[in-house]
Structures are given as C-alpha cells and as structure tokens.
C-alpha cells in the first residue's frame, strides 16, 4: 500500500483510528461530494458540465393526476423519478451512467457560484495559470523509504496550489481551520512529495492555498504559507511518518489512551480552588 495523506492524518488522532479507517473506509459524505464538485468546476471546468448533473423533482404524476413533487432518485432517459412504486419506468437506475456524478440542484448552483468567484478573484486566477490540475504523484520518502502518493490540486513548474472550500467567512477563522484540520501538514506533504518526485525544484516557492467560501457572497482568499507554517507542516509530517513506522513494525495500533488516565477537572470548575458553587449547580 502506498501511503497517502488521507490515511496518514488519522495518526494525529490515534493509530487505532488509522487502522480502523484502512479496514473500514468511510462512505462519501454529502459535504465531501460537494467539495469534489467545487474542485472539478474550478480546476477542470471543461470536464465539469459533462461530468456533474443535478437531480430534479420526480417527473411522474400522482394518482390524482398532479405532478409528483418528491425529489428524484431514479434516472431514466434524461429524466428523474422518485422511489414511489410505479413512478419510475422499468430500467431506471440510481445513476445516469459511468463517469457521471450526481448532486442536488442547490449543490450544483452553489458549485457554479464558487467557481465564478474564484475566476473573478485576480490573485487566484493568476495562480491557476501555467500549470496542470489534479496531478497524481508518487515518490519514495527519502528518510523512511516508504512508498507514498498524492493528488495535487494544481501544480505549476515553480509552485504547488491547494484548493479548499470552506464555511469560514474571515481570515482568522480559516487560519484556525488550517491548524485544526492539519492543512499545513497536508500541503507540506504534497510539496515535499512533488520535489522528491521531480515535479518541483528543491527551491520551489512556498505553496499557496486558495480558500473559497460556500457561504454568501462566496468570497475568495489566496494565502501563501509562511516559512514557519511550512516548516511546522514538515515537522508534523515527519512525526506522523515516524509513528507510522513504529506501529507498522510492532503491529500495534493503540487508541488515544492505551494506559490508565488521571482525570483532573480545570480550575474554573465549580468547587475547584475553593470557588463557590453557583445556584445552577
């Protein structure tokens, strides 16, 4: 198995979680599916219209002869039908065909709005030029010898760009998400992987993150990682790889707390440090 960031990041919670996710892959969530649609619309606009379609309300009629207003879930000959018995023609399927992705109408509208915002954002448009999107890279980690792989959102000859869709509406909130979600580790993983794979020079520019908000007015911000942030990401990656090697060698994948823990409540808790108990307690 070639190690990727989507797997390695689980070690930041516990080795047990990583092992569990390898053995029990998560089904795709609706937010993840929406994120993939946004990525396609922004990074592969020529493929988007032919790949992503939306569901509609059921095109059948009720017994009363009125249009069915249920959301369509079965597809036949360009039309959507609901799951009510008799509404979908024989031969209707859950998917329109191979290579076609389905999202609801609101999601498709949101996807297009996000893509338009990124295109209209001058710094982001400039970054997403002169390179190639959705690049698969493979490399052997120089320090550990582990075979690795990754899928880079956008790769230019001189720099790597990562795209994120977010509900955050301020720079401060998004920066907090970068730390909490380990995005700095992810971008460091891709950058150093691209360098080791010969896709970036050793003196490549620090990578960028383009963040597009999925909340109105679909604002866009482009960030370049500072050197300190990139180095923090690299340290995180090295720590996780070292832990992965240890667990693999031992065949032991412990949870968050394999040993007995002492529980100590914080100082602000009622009763701590002689504090009086509030009426609510």
Model regions and ranges:
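Short histidine-centered catalytic/ligand-binding loop motif
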Residues: 24-27, 99-103, 171-181, 226-228
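Short amphipathic alpha-helical face segments that pack within enzyme cores
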Residues: 33, 37, 185-193
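A residue-level signal for conserved active-site and pocket-lining positions in enzyme catalytic cores
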Residues: 38-39, 154, 237
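Short connector loops/turns at beta-strand edges and beta->alpha or beta->beta junctions
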Residues: 68, 165-169, 212-216
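Secondary-structure boundary elements
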Residues: 124-127, 156-162, 195-205
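Conserved catalytic cores of phosphodiester-cleaving nucleases, focusing on short active-site segments
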Residues: 150-176, 190
């Amino acid at each position: 198995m070639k190690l990727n960031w989507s797997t390695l990041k689980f070690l930041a919670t516990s080795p047990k979680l990583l092992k569990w996710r390898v053995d029990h892959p998560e089904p795709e969530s609706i937010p993840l599916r929406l994120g993939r649609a946004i990525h396609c619309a922004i990074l592969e606009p020529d493929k988007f219209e032919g790949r992503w379609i939306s569901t509609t309300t059921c095109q059948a009629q009720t017994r009363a002869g009125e249009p069915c207003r249920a959301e369509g879930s079965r597809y036949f000959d360009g039309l959507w039908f609901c799951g009510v018995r008799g509404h979908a023609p024989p031969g209707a399927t859950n998917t329109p065909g191979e290579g076609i992705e389905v999202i609801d109408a609101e999601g498709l509208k949101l996807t297009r709005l996000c893509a338009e915002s990124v295109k209209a954002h001058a710094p982001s448009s400039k970054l997403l030029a002169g390179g190639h999107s959705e690049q698969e890279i493979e490399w052997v980690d120089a320090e550990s010898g582990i075979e690795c792989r990754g899928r880079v959102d956008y790769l230019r000859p001189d720099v790597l760009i990562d795209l994120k869709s977010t509900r955050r509406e301020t720079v401060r909130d998004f920066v907090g998400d970068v730390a909490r979600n380990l995005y700095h580790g992810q971008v460091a993983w891709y950058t150093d992987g691209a360098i080791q794979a010969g896709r970036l020079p050793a003196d490549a520019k620090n990578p960028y993150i383009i963040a597009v908000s999925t909340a109105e007015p679909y604002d866009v911000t482009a960030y370049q990682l500072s050197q300190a942030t990139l180095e923090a990401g690299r340290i995180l990656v090295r720590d996780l790889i070292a832990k992965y090697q240890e667990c693999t060698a031992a065949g032991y994948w412990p949870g968050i707390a394999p040993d007995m823990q002492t529980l100590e409540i914080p100082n602000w808790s009622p009763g701590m440090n002689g504090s009086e108990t509030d009426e609510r307690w």
